[in-house]
Amino acid sequence: MPRAKTGVVRRRKHKKILKLAKGYWGLRSKSFRKARETLFAAGNYAYAHRKRRKRDFRRLWIVRINAACRQHGLNYSTFIHGLKKAGIEVDRKNLADLAVREPQVFAELVERAKAAQG
């Protein structure tokens, strides 16, 4: 009786990996070994960039808030300090959204921050 090798299991595993590697260039989509290496790297990049995305968005919001503040004669750090003194708790995401979509409301917040500064 011949020895049973991992025929079905291996084929399933290889098909799964190659299916995930569809669209990759050259051997990276055809060779199991290359596909597995590439998928491993892709997973690492995806993990790192999920963390990175949070930092990138925060930076974008701060840039937008700063630009809008400077139109009203205030810089970002003074504005945030004024908001904290005034007891206004709005996160940076919403502040950036207000600065872009509702400039009048943002101007009101800037005035309140200025007033709280003294």
UniProtKB/Swiss-Prot annotation:
Pfam family, one: Ribosomal_L20
Disulfide bond sites: none
A single GO cellular-component term on record: ribosome
GO biological process terms, semicolon-separated: ribosomal large subunit assembly; translation
Gene Ontology MF annotations: rRNA binding; structural constituent of ribosome
Matching CDD domains: Ribosomal_L20
InterPro entries assigned: Ribosomal_bL20, RIBOSOMAL_L20_CS, Ribosomal_protein_bL20_C
SUPFAM superfamilies found in the cross-reference section: Ribosomal protein L20
Source organism, top-level taxon: Bacteria
Key words, A-Z: Ribonucleoprotein, Ribosomal protein, RNA-binding, rRNA-binding
Function comment: Binds directly to 23S ribosomal RNA and is necessary for the in vitro assembly process of the 50S ribosomal subunit. It is not involved in the protein synthesizing functions of that subunit.
Family annotation (HAMAP family): Ribosomal_bL20
Family: Belongs to the bacterial ribosomal protein bL20 family.
Matches recorded under PANTHER family: 39S RIBOSOMAL PROTEIN L20
Name this polypeptide is given: Large ribosomal subunit protein bL20
Species of the source: Thermus thermophilus (strain ATCC 27634 / DSM 579 / HB8)
Gene from which the chain derives: rplT
